[in-house]
Design a protein with these regions (language model features):
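Extracytoplasmic entry segments of secretory-pathway proteins
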Residues: 2, 16-26
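Bacterial N-terminal signal peptides
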Residues: 8-16
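Sequence context surrounding c-type heme c attachment/ligation sites in exported
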Residues: 22-53, 58, 62, 66, ...
Length: 186
């Protein structure tokens, strides 16, 4: 009974938080917020499996990869036209000031999502580590995930990796982009 009540309370808080977080967002800002929520939920739902806490399900990985890919690349960048940084948006001005890096990260997510689908047949190699402070690796500096002068991830190499490691790369791309281009919530 207590567990059910806690679950219902948590679910209610999540719905209220989502409603409040999108309050006032309309049009393209609302569309991109909805896309980001879909990506966040995809990563959240797959994380226990990638950490070895639930049974591995190839179809769930394929569905997750498709969801990430559907919201990445040009689909993502099209939702950030200049002038769409209204008060309801968490988008920082740096997106438009450093469009090349933002666009590269969106394209990188598309590549990594495709590689995640390809890696779905590869058994998990090691459980995804618990979150650590990756601010140096995933920030705005020249690193594989943070943009700059580093080489782009090789889709063929990623596709050969254990699926949980490719998932970790996808999560790192999300984190790097948010670190550089997303304003903190109030």
């Amino acid at each position: 009974m207590k567990k059910t009540l806690a679950t219902l309370t948590a679910g209610g808080l999540l719905v209220a938080t989502l409603a409040a977080s999108h309050q006032g967002a309309t049009g393209i800002v609302r569309d991109r917020m909805d896309g980001m929520v879909a990506m966040r939920d995809t990563v959240r739902d797959l994380t226990p499996m990638m950490r070895g806490r639930t049974e591995y399900a190839r179809e769930a990985v394929l569905d997750a990869a498709a969801a990430l890919e559907r919201h990445a690349g040009e689909t993502m960048t099209a939702l950030f036209p200049e002038g769409s940084d209204d008060a309801a948006s968490y988008a920082r001005a740096e997106i438009w000031q450093d469009w090349e890096t933002f666009e590269a990260m969106a394209m990188r997510m598309e590549v990594v999502a495709g590689a995640l689908a390809e890696a779905a047949d590869n058994p998990p190699g090691s459980a995804m580590p618990e979150p650590v402070d990756n601010s140096t690796m995933m920030g705005g500096g020249p690193s594989m995930m943070g943009g700059g002068t580093a080489t782009e991830p090789d889709p063929e190499m990623l596709a050969q990796m254990p699926v949980d490691r490719v998932f970790t790369v996808a999560a790192q791309v999300c984190s790097a982009c948010h670190t550089q281009f997303r304003a903190a919530r109030n």
